[in-house]
Amino acid sequence: TYQGLGERRPVLFNSWEGCYFDFDTARILAYIDASRKIGTELFVLDDGWFGARSDDSRGLGDWWVNKEKVDLHKVMAHCKELGMKFGIWFEPEMVDFDSDLFRAHPEYTLGWKEGRTELTLARHQFHLDFACDAVVENIYAQMKAFLEEYHVDYIKWDYNRTVAEHFSNALPPERQGEVYHRLVLGYYRLIGRLTAEYPHIMFEGCASGGGRFDLGTLYYCPQIWCSDES
């Protein structure tokens, strides 16, 4: 359970609409300075900080900091110097075709079968098979490694596409009807472990805005990004 449930929520500034993927350390530091002047208490670095994520067609699934693009330790230290908290964006349930994770484990993708020539793309991304324990464990290990090095105060947990191929390699044919249910259980299992291990981090749920507002999500995410128009 998030330790700060009884506290007033900080005023949040999110980097996304201001720069999208086009940023470096200097630009983010300038955003932090400007946002502090207008009363921001929590600065959130959105999409674009990880892997080879120069646009929305690559990098999802590779949750390591792109140090050639941004010095995240410097960014976080600057926030602390100004008395601000720091947050980061993740989309743990998705993967791009152009990613280290997909190249190493295409079978982690929902609907993947040997010999299949194509999967349904949405926003240039595929859905990971969270019905499979190995997939959940891989993403957990990546996120935990990040959180052990970068002590963030907030995570924006995003989810930006629908489920298309309703097939899991983790389930036998007679249980494929359970795919939706098992995907959700995998999501709960991952976010449950992380919120238990890092109770000081506020997890905010997002799904292209308020697209995932179920009671299970609210159990783990005491705050929801209600609309991408905000």
Task: Give residue ranges: language-model regions.
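Active-site neighborhood of glycoside hydrolase catalytic domains
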Residues: 66-73, 78-81, 103-230
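Aromatic-lined carbohydrate-binding/catalytic grooves of carbohydrate-active enzymes
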Residues: 4-138, 144, 154
